[in-house]
Amino acid sequence: MKVLIFGPSASGKTYLSQALQNLGIHAFDGDDIEGLSAWYNKNGKKIVTPENADEAITNHYSFLWSKKFLTNFLSKFSTVYIFGGSGNITHMFDLFDKIYFLKANPEIQRKRLQSVFRKNPMMDRNEKGLMVWGDWLEEVAQKKGITFLDASQTPEQIFEIISQ
């Protein structure tokens, strides 16, 4: 069974993937899968990671996953859980048996975005303040009838849902 859990920045994807890994489950944060993702300019050319959110937005850069790479990665597991998101996430849906959207309370997201433990805090802010990447994903999930997961649940509670 191949399961995708996607959602906007600071919804808890990294935390959940790590918690499940600690339980011995094949769970991965998409950002930690070497070779899965990269940044691209508007012409589709791979670029170095932007220094901050303003650079990415101003230059119309996109953070995308490689479908070919993901297909190969998923083939290595009979059961696997991928937590993540990208600008082309909907193009990956057909690779998964189940798909969930991780919905977090906006206030909790803001607090998480301000955490000193964020991997790349410069990407979480722009000239207007805090930046939530992928907030458009909720609308996509609603339109596609994807099941929502409450991010305030424990990793064990969420695993109980996604492992069925």
Positions of predicted regions on the chain:
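Walker A/P-loop
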Residues: 14
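Conserved substrate/cofactor phosphate-moiety recognition/catalytic segment
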Residues: 18-67
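Conserved phosphate-donor/acceptor-positioning beta-strand/loop module used by diverse small-molecule
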Residues: 94-116
